[in-house]
Amino acid sequence: MNPLIASASVLAAALAIGLASLGPGLAQGNASGQALEGIARQPEAEGKIRGTLLLSLAFMESLTIYGLVIALVLLFANPFAS
């Protein structure tokens, strides 16, 4: 494997997992804070808010998993290496 392609793949994998975890991490913190604020304002709606929060957190976490998959493909099954 070309050393330039190998080093670029490692750098791209690091960027993929770093950026893929940054956005959802910030969004999950924001969503959790807003959900807690909503529960504090309307305690009777706690069940609906919690269910919606857990579903949205799962969708946000899937973005991080996609970034992990891209990073693993770049590291171990690199399509650019011949």
UniProtKB/Swiss-Prot annotation:
Similarity comment text for this entry: Belongs to the ATPase C chain family.
Descriptive protein name: ATP synthase subunit c
Alphabetical list of InterPro entries matching this protein: ATP_synth_csu_bac/chlpt, ATP_synth_F0_csu, ATP_synth_F0_csu_DDCD_BS, ATP_synth_F0_csu_sf, ATPase_proteolipid_c-like_dom, F/V-ATP_Csub_sf
Any GO molecular function: lipid binding
Species of provenance: Thermosynechococcus vestitus (strain NIES-2133 / IAM M-273 / BP-1)
Residue ranges of the TM segments: 3-23, 57-77
Quaternary assembly: F-type ATPases have 2 components, F(1) - the catalytic core - and F(0) - the membrane proton channel. F(1) has five subunits: alpha(3), beta(3), gamma(1), delta(1), epsilon(1). F(0) has four main subunits: a(1), b(1), b'(1) and c(10-14). The alpha and beta chains form an alternating ring which encloses part of the gamma chain. F(1) is attached to F(0) by a central stalk formed by the gamma and epsilon chains, while a peripheral stalk is formed by the delta, b and b' chains.
Function (record text): F(1)F(0) ATP synthase produces ATP from ADP in the presence of a proton or sodium gradient. F-type ATPases consist of two structural domains, F(1) containing the extramembraneous catalytic core and F(0) containing the membrane proton channel, linked together by a central stalk and a peripheral stalk. During catalysis, ATP synthesis in the catalytic domain of F(1) is coupled via a rotary mechanism of the central stalk subunits to proton translocation. Key component of the F(0) channel; it plays a direct role in translocation across the membrane. A homomeric c-ring of between 10-14 subunits forms the central stalk rotor element with the F(1) delta and epsilon subunits.
Record PANTHER family: ATP SYNTHASE LIPID-BINDING PROTEIN, MITOCHONDRIAL, ATPASE PROTEIN 9
Subcellular location: Cellular thylakoid membrane
NCBIfam families for this protein: ATP_synt_c (TIGR01260), PRK07354.1 (NF005608)
Gene of this entry: atpE
CC terms in the record's Gene Ontology section: plasma membrane-derived thylakoid membrane; proton-transporting ATP synthase complex; proton-transporting two-sector ATPase complex, proton-transporting domain
Activity control, per UniProt: Inhibited by dicyclohexylcarbodiimide.
